[in-house]
């Protein structure tokens, strides 16, 4: 099973394909802000991708647009409510 590894709290959690980073964190008791309720309309749930971005499905237009409008780089920052595991490997993130 692929894992989400949270570098700054030294934790790792198993996930499944198509599960968002936010879902994995919530399921494991890690609270993350979500002003828009997980609909990809804000950036309060953003995470930094340290490695393994190839193990996430690419950001869709709406997510990229939201990130870019707020001065963020969609290659290294993702909305945890939108970033889904593709099942191919682990992703290392940093929670701001």
UniProtKB/Swiss-Prot annotation:
Cofactors, names only: [2Fe-2S] cluster
Domain 2Fe-2S ferredoxin-type: 2-96
Cofactor detail note: Binds 1 [2Fe-2S] cluster.
InterPro entries the UniProt entry points to: 2Fe-2S_ferredoxin-like_sf, 2Fe-2S_ferredoxin-type, Adrenodoxin-like, Beta-grasp_dom_sf
Keywords: 2Fe-2S, Electron transport, Iron, Iron-sulfur, Metal-binding, Transport
Any GO BP: P450-containing electron transport chain
Amino-acid positions noted as binding [2Fe-2S] cluster in the UniProt annotation, renumbered to this chain: 36, 42, 45, 81
Listed CDD domains: fer2
Catalytic temperature dependence: Optimum temperature is 106 degrees Celsius at pH 7. Highly thermostable.
Name of the protein this chain belongs to: 2Fe-2S ferredoxin-5
Originating species: Aquifex aeolicus (strain VF5)
Gene that specifies this protein: fdx5
